[in-house]
Amino acid sequence: MTTEEESLSPGEEGYSVQRDFWRQAAKSDGFDLENVKRPPGMNGVVIGLIPYYCQLYNRYPYRILVDLFAKVGLHRYNLFKGTSFEVAALIKFNMLQNYMSSFYMTLLAHDPDPAASSLEKTFQVRVDEQDYGTLHITCSIARIKAEGNLLVVHYFPYIFFNKISLSLLINNECCIVSTETPFIPHFQGGARAYGIFKGELPDWPSDDAFNDGKRFYLVKESEWQSTDWISMYLELVITTTDRSITETRQKTEVLSQLEIVKVAIETANEDVEPPNERLKAKSAHVYITFKGLAEPRAPRRVFENGEHVERQAIVRRVMDHTGYLTLKGKLCGGEYIKKRSLALKSGEESQDCKKQARVG
């Protein structure tokens, strides 16, 4: 230990170790921590990324959600590149110790297209949660590992944290860590949205509105069955709204009971030929009618129970020119309550996704 290091106060030493951790983690954009070193006795001091090795240990936290986030990354890559990659295996992931976290995942994927190579590719996927108790995530990285660019690394001299989200306050020096943008452990931005894709999610349209063929494309059953991202969107809405599905008991049976009844797509460009090309739109609202969810749960809402009940979910997809993909969604219906003990009164309806005609 140098004389300078010996003279550091405990607080200064903590900052120094914290800074050094993120400097090392930034070299791999947060994906590879195997060679990140920490001084002895400092593991509890450094607030950083927690690594999980999925092929060594069968049990890891948020398993259902992490698996879905890995699929989101490949969905982004496929939209951007026109490929059809599917998850073969999750190798590892690192996550922040935050209420709303960021996930840095490494996985194997293959493209079932006969014209594609049969070899599996190693992908790196980053997904940041933007909200808790609802679907609002951004995927900013989805790449084949071998295609990653070299990094130009500078580092934050001081890093501070709060309990809800990771805040970075920079003193004295600037940090630029990435191929294109600064490395920030928890990214709170998103894809740039325009027009009907800005602001709050829309209300659930009326039955008559769905008959407007210029506004909506009604997805054929054969199309949604062959399009795995539609069921993925639905599962994301349900698991992010009811975190008990993925946090503790890993209730996979809940998702296996879901049955899609109807799907409609709304895009900004209404004159697309053939109409099913709207499925590939970078920005879209996806309206999903489904059943099979016996006991829906959402913060401060109660629902009518029963697998037979048809329910609605809305998902907004926005992917901008940078490749950022933001997904925002909600489970419709239910009755808002002030206290958890209050029950849904017969005949009352939530205003969250009330049906109304499109304005403008």
Language model region names:
Residues 1-360:
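N- and C-terminal low-complexity/disordered segments
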